[in-house]
From Swiss-Prot:
Belongs to the adaptor complexes small subunit family. Its main location: cytoplasm. GO terms for cellular component: COPI vesicle coat; Golgi membrane. It comes from Bos taurus (Bovine). This is Coatomer subunit zeta-1. PANTHER family: COATOMER SUBUNIT ZETA-1, ZETA-COAT PROTEIN.
Length: 177
């Protein structure tokens, strides 16, 4: 057995993908260097799509990875983890992402609506997974936090870049007075 299995760890994902009904990438976020180049990533995505787009199942094993997926109208959602990762946790991430987008897009989860709201997608993915580590599994919380990003967020919930931007704004206004 590998030492990796024996070490306690947080639940992690290797990638989150959204492909259209032709297998083309709409969104892809890889959290490790399993596929370091864009060429390798796109080849992997085509391979996943070819294996999964005609089946009704929700899970596949491909290239030593566990892939959970779901389709909606003209989109295919994928969450990829190692072969040792808990499939239920991967499915929880997938359902959280899908349900969050469904709420944000008012149940209109299709390619056109997604492309018009890519910022919300990026924010939702960042709320659910950070650096491959699963942070949130409640779609209500994700939607709430994504909505807050446009408003004043408490300092404890802001990212470093948000804090720096806020500090710049305050300094700028204090100098202009």
């Amino acid at each position: 057995m590998e030492a990796l299995i024996l070490e306690p760890s947080l639940y992690t994902v290797k990638a989150i993908l959204i492909l259209d009904n032709d297998g083309d990438r709409l969104f892809a976020k890889y959290y490790d260097d399993t596929y370091p180049s864009v060429k390798e990533q796109k080849a992997f995505e085509k391979n996943i799509f070819n294996k999964t787009h005609r089946t009704d199942s929700e899970i596949a094993l491909l290239e030593g990875l566990t892939v959970v997926y779901k389709s909606s109208i003209d989109l295919y959602f994928y969450v990829i983890g190692s072969s040792y990762e808990n499939e239920l946790m991967l499915m929880t991430v997938l359902n959280c992402l899908f349900d969050s987008l469904s709420q944000m897009l008012r149940k209109n989860v299709e390619k056109r609506a997604l492309l018009e709201n890519m910022e919300g997608l990026f924010l939702a993915v960042d709320e659910i997974v950070d650096g491959g580590v699963i942070l949130e599994s409640d779609p209500q919380q994700v939607v709430h936090r994504v909505a807050l990003r446009g408003e004043d967020v408490p300092l404890t919930e802001q990212t470093v870049s948000q804090v720096l931007q806020s500090a710049k704004e305050q300094i700028k206004w204090s100098l202009l007075r």
